[in-house]
Amino acid sequence: NSIKGVNSSDAAITINNSDGTCTANLSNRQGKNLIINGAQLIAQRGTSSTTNGYGSVDRFQVNFSGTDEAPTQAQVDVAAGTTPYSLGFRKALKITNGNQTSGAGSSDYVYYQHKIEAQDISQSGWNYISSSSYITLSFWIKSSVAQSFKGHLKTQDGTSQLYPFDTGSLSADTWTKVTKTIAGNSNLQFDTNNEAGLHIAIMAFIGTDLTASSATENTWQAYAGGIFGGKDNTSTWYTTNDATLEITGVQLEVSDHATSFEHRSFGQELALCQRYFYMHASGAEASANNRAPIATGA
């Protein structure tokens, strides 16, 4: 038996007739978001950088190669009056494109990446080898250029698997929520260790040498080394000088649908980030000795 809300197909409370216990379906349960710093609150390294990799917002890399001018990654404010702002998001991670005077090279790329420890997936409650068990990825994204963007989830353990996806067409300068519900697959493997088990990437641009026309979006497939995002994507953003791309509200949860974002306090989020990178209180001195990455593969 179950109790459902009016016009809802999901049970709010499920009752076990055998022992009389019940289970509540909580959309705001603590710890449901497997992403660390998905609201882009923490930026221990600084608020702006042209560094390749981790340079600004904690736990989110901005990786690039082949650029004529390096892109800038920056923690920025979410503007009041926007939908993400009304949902409690105050920060975003913004990529500002450099001036790519030689055009879109076939091996060029610029993309966001977040890594999750294998043990956090293997012990998440997701029955990842079952096609009837799901995780849902959701995030807010805004581009200064109207186009769609590619992304993927990629596993690390066993035979690496790739799940390519497309954001759908975005209107320029408009925040859009992207949601992807992803079934498990018998080929997935996540070891119980602290290595990077799952990579999540959102591509600003990937060249054609790094794509595969045979890739199928929205399904798991064996990862072909060097293939980043499945199918080709448009180069409009990349060939537009100073084009921008922003993300916030990134959430990955064990669910067959997206639920409300798990907002954590600044202190909670900082503590989670410090497992991977710690800035000493005297970090303003900019001494390399004040920075100590923790030994995990993620």
Q: What role is predicted for each listed range?
A:
Residues 1-9, 13-298:
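Extracellular and organelle-lumenal recognition/adhesion modules and their flexible linkers in secreted
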